[in-house]
Swiss-Prot record:
Top-level taxon in the UniProt lineage: Eukaryota
Gene3D superfamilies linked to this entry: Dynein light chain 2a, cytoplasmic (3.30.450.30)
Protein family (similarity comment): Belongs to the profilin family.
Organism: Olea europaea (Common olive)
Subunit structure of this chain's protein: Occurs in many kinds of cells as a complex with monomeric actin in a 1:1 ratio.
Note: The variability of the residues taking part of IgE-binding epitopes might be responsible of the difference in cross-reactivity among olive pollen cultivars, and between distantly related pollen species, leading to a variable range of allergy reactions among atopic patients.
SMART domains in the record: PROF
Subcellular location, principal: cytoplasm
Pfam families referenced in this protein's UniProt entry, alphabetically: Profilin (PF00235)
Keyword line: Actin-binding, Allergen, Cytoplasm, Cytoskeleton, Disulfide bond, Phosphoprotein
Protein name: Profilin-3
Localisation: Cytoplasm, Cytoskeleton
Amino acid sequence: MSWQGYVDDHLMCDIEGHEGHRLTAAAIVGHDGSVWAQSATFPQFKPEEMNGIMTDFNEPGHLAPTGLHLGGTKYMVIQGEAGAVIRGKKGSGGITIKKTGQALVFGIYEEPVTPGQCNMVVERLGDYLLEQGL
């Protein structure tokens, strides 16, 4: 399966049991900031935004004082999993980022999708990629 297939079929799909509810945007991005695949709605990000995200995975708490920025949007960093998952909130939506061996899996959501549903979709694919050595 192509990387775009993972984004289209495993991230931008209907949430299990909630037909028509899906993430707003999603992407798989290499640790170096290169986009492997993304939805048409994924924001154009700046290199320094990706650097900040990678720094937070290596130094958990790095983004907490300033917030997580992606495509010029600021998210308040909320409880994640140090070195593995970063979660952010903005209004009725938010973001989940799962780190794998070689990539970052991004999911962005708005209501009616819940934070837990976004976490489930993003982390399930991230865990699968980790199992595959990616």
